[in-house]
Curated annotation (Swiss-Prot):
Name of this chain's protein: tRNA (guanine(10)-N2)-dimethyltransferase
GO biological process: tRNA methylation
Keyword annotations: Cytoplasm, Methyltransferase, RNA-binding, S-adenosyl-L-methionine, Transferase, tRNA processing, tRNA-binding
Single GO MF descriptor: tRNA (guanine(10)-N2)-methyltransferase activity
Subunit field text: Monomer.
GO CC annotation: cytoplasm
UniProt xrefs under PANTHER family: THUMP DOMAIN-CONTAINING, TRNA (GUANINE(6)-N2)-METHYLTRANSFERASE THUMP3
Keyword RNA-binding part of the UniProt annotation: yes
EC number from the UniProt entry: 2.1.1.213
Disulfide bonds: none
Segments forming domain THUMP: 57-165
Gene3D superfamilies named among the record's database cross-references: 3.30.2130.30, Vaccinia Virus protein VP39
């Protein structure tokens, strides 16, 4: 079994992104969600976590322990029973991934916070579970840079012991924030959310992705890194030019079909010039801080864009309110930005 740790910044986007990625990688097995921990059968955890914006870790689940009782007064007994159950389980198996040639460390991750889980002694669990693994495998303990990180995941009514297969690249999202790019304009979406929106659009390598309000190119960067072919436009020539500057910085110009200055209401004609009838996905974030009349124009453009999307393709966009389109709404997520702005992330599928 495989376990996924969902990021806690948003209640639903991480799960929606995971379900999209499971679909992208053609997974058809069972899915069990325990709030921020999701269990599947043998799904490609490394590929999914590497590509994700909001999936923190992918695990190979070794042991599952369901609590029969739960009380702060009984916490020592419950932890003892858990440790002894794991010891009995390990006695009858070859512990996966770890042997005397590998180093390991055990770390507790509490994904549920209440008085009971707060009272659990993480250090004790790490020490005792680590000792059991040591006796079984004769592997070396390395607390700073282990070959294998063993996670003890503590949920509301369930404990898991898992080997970490992959961790999300937090450094990428820190080092690639919009203000650190060669061309920057205020109001850009953070790359973590941009990556998640590209994933929600089920973008695959070789797909044609369009951003008709491309701004500084955030969505096109994330789609290009996946291997998609890129089309972008913006009514502001500085933005279109800045997008190309940023795509060049990421060595993605070879993925570009065309980026140009263009009013998005002429996208259909733009695609015709490129001999492209329809695209696989549109991912975009139209401008918000504009007059009521301009907002009306943008909403009309949003209503016409499904015409250039292939059947079964996706239209994923952010807007300050819910927009009804003649497509299948598969997801709607609210992202609080500040007092005056809540982004509504729409995930539409063309049926």
């Amino acid at each position: 079994m495989i376990g996924y740790v969902l990021n806690g910044e948003h209640e639903e986007i991480p799960y929606g992104e995971l379900m999209a990625l499971l679909e992208i990688f053609n997974y058809n097995g069972s899915v069990e969600r325990l709030k921020r921990y999701v269990i599947t059968e043998d799904s490609p955890a490394k590929d999914i976590v590497k590509r994700s914006g909001y999936i923190d870790e992918g695990h190979r689940i070794i042991f599952r322990y369901n609590l029969e009782e739960k009380s702060v007064d009984l916490v020592d007994k419950i932890v003892n029973d858990f440790i002894n159950s794991f010891k009995d389980f390990v006695a009858n198996i070859d512990y996966p991934d770890i042997d005397e040639s590998k180093s390991y460390a055990v770390r507790v991750l509490k994904l549920h916070k209440d008085e009971f889980t707060k009272s659990i002694d993480s250090l004790r669990i790490e020490k005792e579970i680590g000792g059991i693994i040591k006796l079984k495998t004769n592997a070396k303990v390395n607390l700073t840079k282990p070959d294998i990180l063993v996670r003890v995941v503590i949920l509301e009514n369930t404990f898991f012991i898992s080997n970490v297969l992959e961790m999300r690249d937090r450094e990428y999202f820190q080092k690639n924030r919009p203000h650190l790019r060669k061309y920057f304009h205020p109001g850009c979406m953070l790359p973590k959310l941009a990556r998640a929106m590209v994933n929600l659009a089920r973008v695959k390598e070789g797909d044609i992705v369009l951003d008709p309000f491309c701004g500084t190119g955030g969505f096109l960067i994330e789609a290009g890194l996946i291997g998609a072919k890129l089309i972008g436009c913006d009514i502001d020539w500085r933005m279109a030019s800045g997008t190309l500057i940023n795509l060049e910085e990421y060595n993605l110009l070879d993925k570009v079909i065309k980026v140009k200055r263009l009013d998005a209401k002429y996208v259909k004609e733009f695609l015709n010039e490129l001999n492209i009838e329809k695209v696989d996905a549109i991912v975009t974030d139209p401008p918000y801080g504009i007059s009521t009349a301009k907002k009306g124009e943008i909403e009309k453009i949003l209503e016409t864009l499904p015409e250039v999307i292939k059947d079964n393709g996706y239209f994923v966009f952010a807007y300050p309110k819910k927009i009804e389109l003649d497509m299948e709404l598969e997801g709607l997520y609210k992202v609080y930005i500040h007092k005056g702005l809540i982004r509504h992330i729409h995930v539409y599928k063309k049926i």
